[in-house]
Curated annotation (Swiss-Prot):
Source organism of this protein record: Anaerostipes caccae (strain DSM 14662 / CCUG 47493 / JCM 13470 / NCIMB 13811 / L1-92)
Extra information: The fermentation acid butyrate is of special interest, as it has been shown to serve as the preferred energy source for the gut wall and also influences cell differentiation and apoptosis in the colon, and this seems to aid in protection against colon cancer and inflammatory bowel disease. Formation of butyrate via butyryl-CoA CoA-transferase is the only available route for butyrate synthesis in the majority of human gut isolates.
Positions contributing to CoA binding: 220-224, 320, 343, 370
Record's catalysed reaction(s): butanoate + acetyl-CoA = butanoyl-CoA + acetate; propanoate + acetyl-CoA = propanoyl-CoA + acetate
Active site: 245
Pathway info: Lipid metabolism; butanoate metabolism
Protein name listed in UniProt: Butyryl-CoA:acetate CoA-transferase
């Protein structure tokens, strides 16, 4: 049987395909831009007759139809590997929960600890001449997840970019049970957190001054990493490489400015390596069939040993809060879950262990609440219930618009002094009093 004949044999409508779902099932809903669309719509019609359904996914970028039914919590539970704004909203509605992970371990979770998946469904690129459906810009953990699925349903989207890789960037038709030709929606776009602010630019300048020619970059999402990317694109830096968890628009700008060659990378030379991507159409168009860009599973991109083997590795990520001990929360504010651990700790550790490498965790020194009250992001201790994403033992450079502090080798009082020095001036006196109370302040300190 040819691949085209097998394709026709497995072709179903979305309504036909979701009939396989039954109460009590564990479902997989892809990841990020591969979250199903037509299948989600079809399942929403059936969901009121189902109960005790568990669904795994993450970084949902548009409102899902299954969440629009009456009383979703009576029918299913959403289990998120990494939360976005919609999933935070669903927490309040009682059917969404975060699953704490080090993102790099996710393929191993499926292969070693998750017994099985009843039904996996996701959007993919059209089948190629060799019978493969490409995962688009989301290799991530999808190959490992499909290995555990009793039933694999792919939803073909003709707009899905075909993202080349080295391995585990797609699934062969022989491993697929049903094929649905979807409605071909445009690939969901993710903004970079708005235009860079003056604070973002100040932080970016401090970091860019620390980046040498030939460095290998990892950028997170948000205004500060975007500001760093814009500044790099306009700089005199050259021969930069990319080895990152998330590929964002800033990398496209840097590449088109001629700054990225990958010529000095110790591994995957001349290629930009990433686990998943989300951004604007500009990004998806750049990644499509681009042999310079290498889509790879997250246990490859985020492996600490692999990251540390790359010389001059520069990791740039965001934080929510930092306390005077150097503990970093990048995923919650108190008990309120904001995002997830992701791969930040892996890159913080890998960059530090790299020859010439540096990890930068960035944050604005303050934020203003809805009532107009300004608060310090550098705290005496993290808020009660806040999750420690990066421990004080792992923290490297912490950066605000007032400067950067290298935590390595510093005792408790030295850390307190260094962090107070980069806090907003309006909060420094109170932070000194808090440090004294915690017995991490010396009288000889300024």
């Amino acid at each position: 049987m040819s691949f085209k004949e097998e394709y026709q044999k497995k072709l179903k409508t979305a309504d036909e395909a979701v009939k396989v779902v039954k109460s009590g099932d564990w479902l997989e809903y892809g990841w990020c831009v591969t979250t199903p669309a037509a299948l989600d719509k079809a399942l929403a019609k059936r969901m009121p007759e189902l109960e005790n359904i568990n669904i795994r996914g993450g970084i949902v970028m548009w409102p899902l139809e299954i969440t629009k039914i009456d009383s979703p919590a009576d029918h299913f539970t959403w289990n998120s590997w990494h939360m976005g704004g919609l999933e935070r909203k669903w927490i309040k509605e009682g059917f969404s929960y975060y699953a704490p992970i080090r993102y790099s371990e996710l393929p191993g979770y499926y292969r070693n600890y998750i017994d099985h998946v009843d039904v996996a469904m996701m959007q993919v690129a059209p089948m190629d001449e060799h019978g493969f459906f490409n995962f688009g810009p989301s290799a991530s953990h999808l190959a490992a997840m499909l290995e555990k699925a009793d039933c694999v349903i792919v939803e073909v989207n003709e707009n899905m970019p075909r993202c080349l890789g080295g391995f585990e960037e797609g699934v062969h038709i022989s491993k697929v049970d049903m094929i649905v030709e979807g409605e071909n929606p445009a690939i969901a776009e993710l903004g970079g957190g708005g235009a860079a602010t003056d604070v973002d630019k100040a932080v970016a300048k401090l970091i860019v001054d620390q980046i040498p020619n030939g460095a290998c970059l990892q950028l997170g999402i948000g205004g500060m990493p975007n500001a760093v990317g814009s500044m790099i694109a306009e700089s005199d830096l050259k021969d930069l490489g990319v080895h990152t968890e998330m590929y964002v628009d800033a990398f496209v700008d840097i590449a088109k400015a001629g700054k990225i060659t990958g010529a000095r990378k110790n591994i995957d030379r001349y290629r930009q390596t990433y686990a998943f991507a989300a951004g604007t159409k500009k990004l998806y168009d750049y990644l499509n069939d681009n042999p310079e860009c290498m889509s790879a599973p997250v246990n490859y991109t985020n492996d600490i040993a692999r990251v540390s083997s790359i010389d001059n590795f520069i990791s740039i990520n965001n934080a929510v809060d930092v306390d005077l001990y150097g503990q970093i929360s990048a995923e919650s504010s108190g008990i309120k879950q904001i995002s997830g651990a992701g791969g930040q700790l892996d890159f913080v550790m890998g960059a530090y262990l790299s020859n010439g490498g540096k990890s930068f965790v960035c944050l604005s020194s303050t934020f203003t609440d809805k009532a107009g009250q300004m608060h310090s992001r550098i705290l005496p201790t993290l808020h009660n219930g806040s999750i420690v994403t990066d421990t004080r033992a792992n923290a490297h450079y912490i950066v605000t618009e007032y400067g950067m502090a290298n935590m390595k080798g510093l005792s408790a009082w030295q850390r307190a002094e260094a962090l107070i020095n980069i806090a907003h001036p309006d909060f420094r006196d109170q932070l000194i009093k808090d440090a004294e109370k915690a017995q991490i302040w010396r009288r000889s300190n300024k």
